[in-house]
């Protein structure tokens, strides 16, 4: 072969290679252009939002899993329903909500001097009610009062975040400021509600007095502190700020963590802190974890799943004292047993704060007593929903009922046809990733 022939052959080969590379690049751009954007879907039962881009790694769905590709037996991480109960979702803008409210039959005409609705609490319940009200009224003044920043996040995912060592801000789906702007509501963040003056329809706060036409208490429940324990010596992880501080204290090195209480929250925390590399001691007065669901063998199933994790469960023990010894803590039980730990977490149930309810002389029964169908308290124009309420003396501190409660209250506040709330037993999904459980 002559040099000229060799050069020609090389040129042709180079041209073919360049053409192939160009075609591959064009194909890649075409694929990117034609690929459908990631979608979001909302659980019709509890309001959990599934983002295809994020997936549900703890439920076995890697990022990028389309809804159509999700197995039929997959369950909502919060309430346990299947993907059939999910609908397409796009966070509505204020303009869209106004258009929706304007298109609806007029059900509420606000008097000129009507001060509107004041909601105490900007957790799931408070924001759910604000959004439901705005869907039906574009003009109703809505004010949310919250002691925190008011950022929106799914509280049940706090324990899961421990195992994945997520930054707290990664849990925030929408900042309080952005949510307030989108819904056209007034958010008083880092503001404490101090007292209710029911006779004058006023709420006293650390930022002044607010008049209300309707007042809604949605301030949730706090992690209970057993007698004899001091809050300064124990963690209670029931909101984003507490999670952030605990994560900072735990740092990057494995720690000895003692958890008091092996119910739903305590068991999930134990599971996920252990998966995060920490050594866990879990104490409870009952003989097994999740004792409330003893008839469903929940405890034995968990203990079996934990065999390969650094979780030591000790049942039948009542904690008497927690004290600081040097840089660590010593936990003593009523039977005299002692345990040492780097950090102590209390997960011994939830207790709604009573101060506001007492100031308005609201009926109380393990929570703010409300009517089973209307969620009205014992005082006119004061309502409640979420973790802070009790119905016929029974509490239901789960996510699923909140959307239905919000619809009931919105109808009552706006003078629409009644939408009675139906109280029913919740299906509980235990987010212990070692062995997820669905309990009834």
Task: Annotate each language-model stretch with its function.
Residues 232-253, 330, 338-411:
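FAD-site-proximal beta/loop scaffold in flavoenzymes
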Residues 33, 139, 182, 186-205, ...:
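A Rossmann-like FAD-binding core segment of flavoenzymes
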Residues 40-59, 109-185, 271-294:
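Beta1-alpha1 glycine-rich phosphate/pyrophosphate-binding loop at the start
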Residues 120, 210-222, 339-349, 406:
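Short hydrophobic core segments
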Residues 58-73:
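Short linker/helix segments within small regulatory modules
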Residues 99-106, 217-276, 371-372:
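Glycine-rich dinucleotide-binding loop and its adjacent helix/turn
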Residues 150, 156-159, 171-172, 256, ...:
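Rossmann-like dinucleotide-binding cores of NAD(P)H-dependent redox enzymes
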């Amino acid at each position: 072969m002559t040099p000229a022939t060799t050069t020609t052959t090389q040129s042709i080969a180079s041209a073919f290679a360049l053409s192939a590379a160009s075609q591959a690049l064009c194909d890649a751009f075409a694929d990117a252009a034609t690929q459908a954007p990631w979608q979001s879907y909302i659980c019709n039962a509890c309001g959990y939002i599934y983002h295809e881009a994020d997936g549900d790694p703890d439920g076995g769905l890697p990022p990028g899993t389309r809804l159509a590709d999700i197995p039929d037996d997959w369950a909502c991480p919060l309430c346990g329903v299947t993907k059939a109960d999910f609908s397409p979702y796009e966070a509505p803008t204020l303009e869209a909500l106004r258009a929706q409210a304007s298109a609806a039959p007029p059900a509420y005409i606000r008097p000129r001097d009507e001060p509107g609705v004041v909601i105490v609490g900007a957790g799931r319940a408070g924001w759910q009610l604000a959004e439901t009200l705005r869907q039906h009224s574009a003009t109703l003044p809505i004010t949310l009062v919250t002691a925190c920043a008011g950022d929106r996040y799914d509280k049940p995912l706090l324990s899961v975040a421990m195992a994945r060592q997520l930054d707290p801000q990664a849990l925030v789906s929408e900042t309080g400021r952005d949510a307030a702007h989108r819904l056209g509501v007034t958010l008083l963040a880092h503001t404490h509600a101090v007292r209710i003056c029911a006779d004058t329809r006023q709420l006293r706060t650390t930022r002044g007095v607010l008049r209300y036409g309707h007042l809604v208490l949605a301030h949730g429940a706090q992690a209970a502190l057993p007698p004899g324990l001091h809050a300064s010596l124990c963690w209670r992880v029931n909101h984003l700020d507490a999670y952030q501080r605990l994560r900072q204290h735990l740092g990057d090195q494995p720690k000895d963590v003692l958890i008091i209480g092996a119910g739903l929250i305590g068991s999930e925390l134990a599971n996920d802190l252990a998966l995060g590399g920490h050594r866990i001691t879990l104490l409870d007065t009952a003989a097994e974890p999740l004792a409330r669901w003893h008839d469903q063998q929940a405890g034995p199933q968990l203990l079996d799943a934990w065999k390969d994790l650094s979780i030591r469960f000790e049942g039948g023990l009542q904690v008497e004292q927690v004290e600081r010894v040097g840089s660590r803590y010593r936990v003593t039980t009523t039977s005299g047993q002692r345990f040492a730990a780097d950090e102590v977490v209390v997960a011994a149930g939830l207790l709604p704060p009573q101060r506001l309810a007492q100031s308005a002389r609201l009926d109380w029964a393990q929570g703010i007593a409300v009517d089973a169908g209307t969620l009205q308290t014992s005082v006119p124009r004061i309502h409640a929903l979420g973790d802070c309420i009790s119905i016929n003396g029974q509490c239901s501190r789960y996510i699923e009922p909140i959307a239905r409660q919000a619809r009931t209250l919105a109808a009552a506040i706006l003078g629409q046809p009644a939408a009675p709330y139906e109280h029913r037993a919740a299906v509980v999904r235990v987010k212990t990733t070692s062995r997820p459980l669905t309990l009834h």
